Amino acid sequence: RLKLTGRNLFFNLRLIRQYGLVPFDSYEGTQPRNVNAINRKAMIVAQQKAGEKATMASFKNALNSYLDDALGALPLNVYLFGVEYTPLQFAQSIVPADSYKAYCSVTHHPFYREVLQESPDNNSYELFNNVPIDSLMHIIDSQLSAHKAVCWEGSLPQDEYIMEQGVAQLDSKISRVDQNMRQHAIESYTTYDQHAMSIVGKAHDKHGNIYYIAKNSWGKNIPFGG
């Protein structure tokens, strides 16, 4: 199981390509670790070093020393199924380079080009392929038809997402979102990259209305087991 949090998906993928991956079981010791507590302590280390006006090298040394104590020393190699990998080789075997593509649909940039997506979580300036909204929906549907998941980043307004039912719906008066409606929502900040989920399939109700099935990260104690 792989879990990445923070910023957007492509920022995390770039970190994987740059630094590699190490399975949790590759670390020495079998005692469970409280990841939340480790994160809080790491933040305290950073704040202390900032207060000391320490150099980046001093901060990295202090943080690495703490992480070695909390997690164990960083493994230089990964051993899995009788094969030895470096962290970068292991990452490439799990997430091959260019195995994901990012798409957006905005009219203030030209279509069919890589553009900078101006969204709060894209502070690493990742580029997205800008396509018309109909093309974007076709890409999503074609990937699902090929049994591939799609990472969705967007917002879940309280008046559109009913947690008790596990369903998100637009106003019933809106039969179809067109390019102009989407652009207005983006420019008015009524939609933005507040949350991310994996779209894994499609479904329909007895009236023929189409729904996209998305896996959430809020646990299994919600409708449809998450």
Model-derived segments and spans:
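Papain-like cysteine protease catalytic cores
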Residues: 1-84
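Active-site signature of cysteine proteases
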Residues: 61-226
